[in-house]
């Protein structure tokens, strides 16, 4: 297994680690500990960086593989969807936003698996809108977890601004997610039609 694919697997492994720290505390409760959100934010930021790094190295070293094309967006989905579920728990992410994200991910993942299981074994890579969507999602999540940690520190106003920004970014994420999903299905409509 090459290095870019190892980085992708590392991102998947970091998902349950992120979940552990976010689950240790909850904003709005008496025993809320911002340190755990800070640690979770650092873990998420590190995992997000591997998303940039694995793609960059795969292209630079000509190590693009079918596994990478399939596993890289899957790792992104796991990481960001889990984070948004916890943001919903905290009251920052609207259920509407999460439903749009889940609907898009299920539809696109279903299409990818269907294409991979077809006779020609086609692997559908992420498109530009999918990458824009992922970057927006990751920035929103990073703003939220670091912002939440700061609201209980010495930089209350900066932290509050970050949390406020992350709330509105969630809606921007919903728009980008919907557009990327529609474009993805449209670009692969020929496969969808033949699969009927």
What are these regions (language model features)?
Residues 1-196:
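Alpha-helical transmembrane bundles and membrane-interface segments of multipass inner-membrane proteins
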């Amino acid at each position: 297994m090459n290095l870019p694919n190892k980085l992708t697997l590392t991102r998947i492994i970091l998902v349950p680690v992120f979940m552990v720290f976010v689950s240790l505390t909850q904003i709005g409760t008496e025993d809320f500990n911002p340190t755990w959100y800070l640690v979770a934010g650092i873990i998420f930021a590190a995992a997000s960086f591997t998303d940039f790094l694995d793609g960059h190295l795969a292209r630079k070293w000509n190590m693009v593989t079918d596994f990478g094309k399939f596993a890289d967006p899957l790792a992104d989905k796991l990481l960001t969807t889990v984070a948004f579920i916890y943001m919903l728990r905290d009251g920052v992410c609207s259920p509407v936003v999460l439903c749009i994200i889940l609907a898009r991910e299920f539809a696109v993942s279903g299409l990818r698996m269907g294409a991979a299981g077809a006779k020609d074994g086609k692997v559908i890579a992420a498109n530009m809108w999918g990458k824009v969507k992922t970057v927006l999602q990751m920035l929103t999540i990073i703003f939220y977890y670091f912002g939440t940690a700061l609201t209980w520190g010495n930089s209350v106003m900066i932290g509050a601004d970050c949390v406020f920004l992350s709330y509105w970014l969630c809606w921007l994420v919903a728009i980008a997610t919907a557009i990327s999903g529609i474009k993805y299905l449209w670009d692969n409509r020929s496969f969808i039609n033949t699969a009927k």
